[in-house]
């Protein structure tokens, strides 16, 4: 079987996938795209250490011309859908890590692009792949806890100490500008994965923009909460964000 030729768009968020593509026996890392030259140099050194030939690009339009079977999207989280659609329409499979889309309009356009292309689209919300999440799924699907009626997911992570690093010091970086309910997948994803149930309605709330985050450039609330109704009538409370708590909290209950 020939190896799957993989390109990664986004060298910082995508570094884990870059390493896995280099190490996986059925994959071949062929290209990386990132606008920051230091990250490309890091990828160049990593590829050289492993004896792998990888093309490096600073522009997506050049990157998409490379001979690739699949693309890992690890670019800015609020820009995945347009790039996923371009990759699908060019005949590539797509893995998005993370997020899927920023609006309902983008969600519809993405689904339609997948259907037209016939290619595989994988949403790689990483907290769905923890051992504990698989244990939750196995127990629920086996019927150990009956039918789900209420669940809670919590992901509290104060990133203020690394904010300049993860935003590259950009005042208009998506982490500074997007509404706080946007990045809900760490808290909500494992519940949906474990139960296999689809959400049918949602209402969301933001906390106020706390001074310690506002000083770093954020424009939205410091944390977000969603109340989600699932297709069987179950309710899920999802809370996430950068509230001050040491240590951080990752917690799921069903």
Where are the predicted features?
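A short helix-to-beta-strand connector/capping loop
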Residues: 49-55, 116-120
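Short acidic low-complexity segments
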Residues: 55-66
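Predominantly a Rossmann-like dinucleotide-binding segment in NAD(P)-dependent oxidoreductases
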Residues: 12, 127-219
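Short, well-ordered coil/turn residues at beta-beta hairpins
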Residues: 74-75, 97, 230, 239
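Beta-strand-loop-alpha-helix segment that lines the small-molecule cofactor/substrate pocket
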Residues: 69-70, 76-77, 81-129, 143
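NAD(P)-dinucleotide binding in Rossmann-like oxidoreductases
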Residues: 215-216, 231-254
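Short, Asp-centered acidic motifs that coordinate Mg2+ and/or phosphate
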Residues: 31, 70, 150
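N-terminal Rossmann-like dinucleotide-binding module
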Residues: 1-50
